[in-house]
């Protein structure tokens, strides 16, 4: 049985910045292992983000996305042969707005919660989001090149960081909202004696996790500037 998953990755960038024609027309198509055939030009993926593997990949990606300077702190231990939760997410740069928007969108997509109660991811995410809200009750974003909150000089390093944070925050917010408004397009092709039966169920938790990973990858790859 062939399972084709097609994602349009250009639509959500249109809200943030103009793209080249080739980028606008780009689509993401993958054929997963176990299918009957692998058409030329399609990416072969060894792992579909499942209930446990997908969460692990998401956590690892979030760690890499939020760690400045090579993530040296992620190897620190708390003395009990476990990685200290406080060492996982050093919230600097645009990591704070990314996590803030991610939490809001996840709550909107799945009211019952994306992470299982017995999963360490949920506890870590809750603790870090509470920590982020205490450290950054409000981001001093810039509007039309002027600080909304008092700063010594608009050209100071602090203003530069705030400007990058706010730009990235706006891009992530629009991107995630676009994905919520336009759900993942999933098509399962089942062949029974030469008869193709098409089904288009709603996105599952694993598919939503994968979609968010793609969004965060694009954001971290492009940095505070738009791709294209």
Swiss-Prot record:
Ordered alphabetically, the record's keywords are: Cytoplasmic vesicle, Endoplasmic reticulum, Golgi apparatus
**Matching Pfam families, A to Z?**
RESP18
- Please state where this protein is localized: Endoplasmic reticulum; Golgi apparatus; Cytoplasmic vesicle, Secretory vesicle lumen
Query: Is Lipid metabolism among the key words of this record?
Result: no
Keyword Repeat attached: no
Its transmembrane ranges are none
Q: Which InterPro entries does UniProt cross-reference here?
A: RESP18 (IPR024833), RESP18_dom (IPR029403)
Q: Which domain of life is it from?
A: Eukaryota
Cellular component GO terms, alphabetically? cytoplasmic vesicle; endoplasmic reticulum; Golgi apparatus
Q: What is its main location?
A: endoplasmic reticulum
Q: In which tissues is it expressed?
A: Pancreas. Found in alpha, beta and delta cells in the pancreatic islets.
User: What family is it from?
Assistant: Belongs to the RESP18 family.
Record's function text: May play an important regulatory role in corticotrophs.
Q: What is this protein called?
A: Regulated endocrine-specific protein 18
Q: Say which species the protein is native to.
A: Homo sapiens
Q: Name the gene for this chain.
A: RESP18
